[in-house]
């Protein structure tokens, strides 16, 4: 079952400063749409900056899929206001367009023209576009327009170096990497609680269901939107944004060196399925970067990833190998449609508590049987999380308990951790967020997915989406900046375009040579 961590919490209560200095970062994706809800057909606006080199505003899969990236900070209000400033600036440059508030796009037919993101004529720009062409050919383009929130989280160095469980590690790098792998394994075990609480994609367009095996009996509304009565986050399902089963790749997060080796193997091992796509078309244009299981590191779609900031010319794996894990990236958050910026403060506070808890509790190594059971738990919550008396596997003997029972055990600890964090800042923010969110366990109608489904059934996805998109747009264009200002943002636009031109001028190798050297 779940370890009793009362002694560990008692230790933290005596040493609350161990949890002072948590750093976070947010990445928010959102589709640019026309006023009628259809996909924008325009390229990434020049007035926003270069998507290749802008520090804070870029594109993801397609030209109309915006991505906002905050710097890291230990101040939650700063992060949220910075993210709001980026939205306000963007809204001022796309006055005839809107930002779609849901993770799942509104698709009125299957002929939606999706323009893959373009990054210019430099080798790095061509590589980014070719990678996306590969994603289209491997998984389809519509599936890659599903948007989400990525939450980056790191615990203070002081915590890792003083944490009693880590005293036998050789050096700080090993100690921290091992600690984050413990956290990651526990996130796989218990992270299903995140889509239960905050999942916001209980419905999906019929076009996403083409050529997929339906494990569950979907219902359909008048807009041709398919839904399940108890679902939470279809974005995280095999219908949505997923590709490779990490079990097949033997990526188990048990040992740092084994993780690196397994990841490298996936990047080097050819895939029969992708060989059949072909590397180039009849005109000699690349159809994908290579025919390996993964083209690059970013293609491994998982609920949580170990990360490290990279230096110029360095890959993520090289950075991890050289300097260890620096932070974790949570990828299982849907866009929160009830927040103009896709995420709110309560969510961040709750995620902090839960990730600290994942770092504190015992984290045995995961074997394949364990991993299959954790996958079943995630699947149950994704498809039927709000089902009354929903059961969760608690060990590999197929023993189960109800979601409410396990959730209450988790929240008992989270409330204790909240007390410690609030003592550092002399307020009640964490305790308040914890108590409010705990109500979702016994009152599933309070969950984001239940609220979303209610709107989709009564008002419809198009009407609800456009109402929220217009409401948020007006809010953004009439809002004063918090941290940034118009001048700083305009200067970044100019700098980004200049930097893009510099990169293009400095290229020496042909694109083929560049790819070969990667």
UniProtKB/Swiss-Prot annotation:
Its EC number is 6.3.2.2. Keywords: ATP-binding, Glutathione biosynthesis, Ligase, Nucleotide-binding. GO terms for biological process: glutathione biosynthetic process. It is an enzyme of class 6 (ligase). It catalyses: L-cysteine + L-glutamate + ATP = gamma-L-glutamyl-L-cysteine + ADP + phosphate + H(+). Pathway: Sulfur metabolism; glutathione biosynthesis; glutathione from L-cysteine and L-glutamate: step 1/2. One of its GO terms (molecular function) is glutamate-cysteine ligase activity. InterPro entries: Gln_synth/guanido_kin_cat_dom (IPR014746), Glu_cys_ligase (IPR007370), Glut_cys_ligase (IPR006334). The keyword Ligase applies. One of its GO terms (cellular component) is cytosol. HAMAP family: Glu_cys_ligase. NCBIfam families: glu_cys_ligase. Belongs to the glutamate--cysteine ligase type 1 family. Type 1 subfamily. This is Glutamate--cysteine ligase.
